[in-house]
């Protein structure tokens, strides 16, 4: 069974996500879909001028995965430009932020993205999870989730 795809960390979203060639009739335009993480890879490498290792580190993926993503992105952009296709930026397997959580019951450490509300431990199903970063609670994920109260109740029992 293949490993699950890791979320790619993305820091930038474009204001415009659709680009079409000027003067070409709409009925003749074909569309190339550029994933959000592919655009992020090109931004880091070509605009920020980071090396491959720095880019991979920022996106929280391996160097090989980064290379595969940027190769795919550059190929899509080159095809769109040479064939006069539209470029649509959408989709992909990305997140704006990852959070490491720790289960108090089984001590499993796992990652979630903020777009995914995972308040149950994937290992034991417990709801007693805390943010593993500095043994504190993740402000963005745990805020309003009553996680801190649950944890303190479990400590007092």
Swiss-Prot record:
Any Pfam family hit: DUF134
SUPFAM superfamilies xrefs: Sigma3 and sigma4 domains of RNA polymerase sigma factors
Signal peptide: none
Matches recorded under InterPro entries: RNA_pol_sigma_r3/r4-like, UPF0251
Disulfide bonds: none
Family designation: Belongs to the UPF0251 family.
Alphabetical list of PANTHER family matching this protein: PTHR37478, UPF0251 PROTEIN TK0562
Protein name in the entry: UPF0251 protein CLD_3165
Species of origin: Clostridium botulinum (strain Okra / Type B1)
Record lineage: Bacteria, Bacillati, Bacillota, Clostridia, Eubacteriales
């Amino acid at each position: 069974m293949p490993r699950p795809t890791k979320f790619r960390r993305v820091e930038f979203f474009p204001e415009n996500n659709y680009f079409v060639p000027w003067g070409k009739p709409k009925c003749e335009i074909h569309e190339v879909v550029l994933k959000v993480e592919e655009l992020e890879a090109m931004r880091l490498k070509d605009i920020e001028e980071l090396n491959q290792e720095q880019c991979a580190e920022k996106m929280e993926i391996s160097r090989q995965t980064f290379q595969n993503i940027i190769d795919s992105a550059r190929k899509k952009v080159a095809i769109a430009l040479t064939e006069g296709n539209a470029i649509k930026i959408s989709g992909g397997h990305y997140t704006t932020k990852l959070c490491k959580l720790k289960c108090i019951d089984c001590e499993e450490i796992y990652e979630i993205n903020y777009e995914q509300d995972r308040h149950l431990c994937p290992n034991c199903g417990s709801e007693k999870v805390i943010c593993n970063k500095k043994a504190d609670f993740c402000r963005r994920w745990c805020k309003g989730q009553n996680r801190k109260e649950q944890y303190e109740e479990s400590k007092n029992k």
